[in-house]
Amino acid sequence: MVQLLTTASTQRPANPLTLPFVHLNLHFNPFGELPLKYRAKLAVIDTTPLLEHLARPRAVLQLIGEKGHGKTTHLLALKDCFSAASYVHFPEGKRPPVPEGNPLILDEAQRIPWWQRRQLFQRPVPLILGTHRDFTRQLQRMGRDVKTVQAGDKTDRQQLDKIVRQRIEFARRDPGPVPTVPLATIDQLLDQHGDDIRAIEGHLYDLFQHLERPCHVEM
């Protein structure tokens, strides 16, 4: 959980030496859970080929992947590319209302009841799906032009290094040294967790919780 710091009292400002993570020159742990609007802002995604597909008639972009592999981050980054887009997340066992949107972005589409899913798939707007299940055959039977992307399948050391650097810079407090994650640690994280970005962030969160000063972070 990311906690943004505020002044402790209108009478007396907080002693900066007692603020969390001030010893690391950070406002907060960079690898805690971020609000959705910041996840989109910090996404490291090449949206160009995805947007090119969505410009095609009856386009559907399908992002498939297990939990923690970046589906929702992709969806939120794409939402920011469209002023009229609508994003709907389907929690387990619930059916939230689905507004009009162009495109319409459906997160956890595998949880949508089949009859509602059929209705949504027939809407005359581009669709962007985050799903654990492949709906290609069903969509093609409806005449949709489907592009499928495996979320997280291109997470390599270069991309992960960029993600990590952006998160640390986002949490930076002032000019000066901050903790850094060397490529040797990036490689170890990929060896241990593969392309599970959420697991990597959790591991880094624990490492940063125990740092005493800005340094090279090692496993």
Listing of model-derived features with the role each one plays in the protein:
Residues 1-57, 127, 206-219:
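A short, basic N-terminal segment
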Residues 56-75:
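Walker A/P-loop nucleotide-binding motif
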Residues 60-62, 86, 103, 126:
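Residue-level preference for the first positions of well-ordered beta-strands
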Residues 179-219:
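Amphipathic alpha-helical "lid/sensor" segments that cap RecA-like P-loop NTPase cores
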